């Protein structure tokens, strides 16, 4: 994220132009704004999402118009808001455009924009209008560690892009660093068997809570909450945690939580002095979240999309000094584990097929719109 934050903040100090960062997850934008605030960028960096109150949103629109914000984080859905577009247009008219239009986790443009989140296509169309109005001075930038050749080609079909820092014929690098080891284990489909594997994993690695954190990725919000309770009980039975500590050491995190609860859980998980060191999370914690000492990752079951898996595994070992102090290195890599059953693979294929619109579906939608 510093690759776009640095230029945006530096240039804005001279041009006073606004940079927009389009990001797919609320938790991700709040994390980045919080980190910038800790570095002293308090009044000129902000975010807009559904957790903000009416008064907060109104105040941010005022700050946009007044030229007080240098970087604004938004979800793609925000570009459906007439009030937002009005505030943005007013600022752009005064400044003759934006400094940067930035797409963070840009692989989501294709992965979700084509299949699940048409809002991304709407944002790109809006960007094209901006460029038509203000010319090529407005830079559109896309950032991601997990853009495959297929996703790159899909994005390029919508809006021409150029890879920076590599030759045109050079393959995209492997986003998984050499100090991370990925293991996969075939298990029975039911939750009790998966739970036992996770307990065995925790026993085997003897996790020290004051130097390491552990993530358990679950598919659904209910799974997160259920797993946190079941695991607390099993770790108590196994003698790994006391009854009192088991209720404090394990938590859950997902986008359906109240904003304050989600923020509190994130703060606790990041604080090495807090007993919370195992977090059951959905993909809401899988992109861009920067906890420096996550040294253990387990997937309860594989994600439906490979890019999600790479992003989630990529949460591990973000701080070299911390993972070396915890005993990890290229010769003794951080252990990640993905549990899967034959039924998981079958269901993933079914979900991908169900997510594709057929001509029959499109015809039904057309009839419904016209009726």
Please name every model-derived segment:
Residues 70, 77-80, 84-135, 139:
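SF2 helicase catalytic motif II
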Residues 130-133, 137-139, 146-204:
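Interdomain hinge/linker at the junction between the two RecA-like core domains of SF2 helicases
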Residues 63-87, 269-289:
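Conserved two-lobed SF2 helicase motor
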Residues 18-24, 73, 140-142, 212-220, ...:
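Conserved RecA-like ASCE P-loop NTPase motor core of nucleic-acid helicases/translocases
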